[in-house]
Amino acid sequence: MHKVIQSASSETDSPSVMGSGCGEGHGNGNANGSSVATNLAFTKFFFVIARADDDAHGARLRAAGGNIARGFFNDFDIDDARELQAQRFETIQFCVREGDAPADCPGPCLPQARHMVQVSSKYRPRLQEIDEELRRRIGDSAEILSLEGAFRNPRYSSAELVQYSTRNAPPRRSGRLSKNVILLPMRKTSEWWEKSALERHSYFYPHVDHNSATPVKGHALAAEKGIPALFRRVYHNPDGYERAGEFDFVSYFECDDESLPVFDQVISSLRDVRQNPEWCYVQEGPMWRGRRVLRW
């Protein structure tokens, strides 16, 4: 999220309904909301776009992956029960893109990256060290894009909504079962942040739309089908919202193969501004889809 998508090669869990940050306060601490929330831990996604995806690059990539994984728990086999036993935030997860790269994609283009790794830590400088080490090892043979995020406690407008969005939510499962990963960075428009916190919260609920004067589902009901099918997290910009040229959130999903159509249905429903007017204020970044793997 730093500088929208940071090019590392050129520069030295709280579940939600779908995770676009409707319930969060204002990131810069003005009268419409609260100050920047406490970052509990940090995460960084690295997207590797090989200049020549050949055997030589593959060997260097595997060696680099093994090196940066030292000292981290591998998330591939961590499920809900094991997460409670492990150092939850000192983790690493490797992923490989599903399908072919898009033929035409304006840069910087995350979907062009065949390989992605997510590293999480309570200590942000540790992630910068990983950034520098990865660039040192493969930066001459690949472009490396990165997104930063932070774990924060959920701040919904009611306990009822928390219960609604978590009651039937699935536990996290290992990568052998929940094989798919989907990432969607996004930002909210300035018009969104100009609204009061109370008005922003209302977009989560069924309500009467101000513009059409008709009843609409709102965010929660629009995303309802995804609650039992998708494991999800929202990562927040660690430096606050409304920062020029940066994303506010990264929505993160895991699911099995059978649930992929559910994700597509949910994102389509959320994009339908006739039922979810909140999406009028959402600017989506490039979506990345891949498979969780034990190692590169």
What are these regions (language model features)?
Residues L230-H236:
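A short linear hydrophobic-aromatic micro-motif
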Residues H236-F247, Y252-W296:
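Alpha-helical oligomerization segments
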Residues H2-L230, E242, D257-P261, V293-W296:
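Short S/T/G/P-rich N-terminal loop/turn motif that feeds into the first structured element of a domain
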